Amino acid sequence: MTTNPSAELLDNLLTATGQTTAVREEVRVWSMSGVERVAFPDGSTAIFKYAKKPFDSEDQALRLAHTLGVPVPQVHASAVLNGWLGMLMEDLGPSVREADDLDGVAAAVILHGTRTAPPLPVLDQNRLRTLPARALEHLERLRKADRWQDADDVKDALDRIAQAAEARSAGATLEPFGWVHSEFHPTSLHIGERGWRLLDFARAFTGPGLLDLSSWHGTIEPPHPIRLRVYLEQYVTAGGTPDALAPRGGLTAEHWALGWHRMWAVEWFMEQSIRWINDPATDPAYIKAVRRHLTDVLHLLEI
């Protein structure tokens, strides 16, 4: 496992911003990233965020979003060391309340209305329809490592989805197509005294905006197409493109969005399992999540 170089990263960032010392306070830390509040001798504060691949280009996405007019925290300085990104960012302070559905659609309308930017990876129809095949490749590598041996049902489900993917991925580039936040949840929207800011751009890409809208209510509870339909209608009312309600891939917009969002999550979980986390001890939790999502995908995409 790569040693976390956060102390050295912070030293580099302090030098870059003309600071000499800072007191660190953990906000949230996990194996691949961390967020801390740092206090400087003059009483000012900043947010120190560090992350390893594949989360190591968030500074570029945040600066790009800021340039294009999306309300995001300002990046004061960033540095990369041994495959880890470190950022010193504006401290937004405490939130005054939790973000609600109307806050979410307002933020999505602004983000999705932003012109797309070349540095962002692209998830178009060709890329979308390969997600089940990519997940099968991850499964093959896991099994070669003598892991996921009792997951024939996962392979069978992915095979079925792969066969239907060409037809079901149709309409991927219908509007809204552009900036996708990809971690679009109420916790990613900070409502402060000076308005809102969108956080956590580490996995932003260019693709179907419906994936953002379908992620807002999370993946812990079973997917709820009727609730998403209401949310899509709120999005259109708030100024989002009416095409957000248009059928695609032979499905309603809400079924298409929820189904492909879950398939996108499955491929990401499996890539984490073999490539980024790569810890057999986590396999039972990953397999459980993948099975649950694949059941939803088969139902939502009517396969």
Where are the predicted features?
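Membrane-interface aromatic/basic loop that binds lipid-linked glycans or pyrophosphate carriers
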Residues: R291-I303
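ATP-binding pocket architecture of kinase catalytic cores
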Residues: V27, M32-R127
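Active-site acidic catalytic loop and adjacent metal/ATP-binding pocket
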Residues: R28-F40, E166-L211
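Juxta-kinase regulatory segment immediately upstream of eukaryotic protein kinase catalytic domains
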Residues: M1-E25
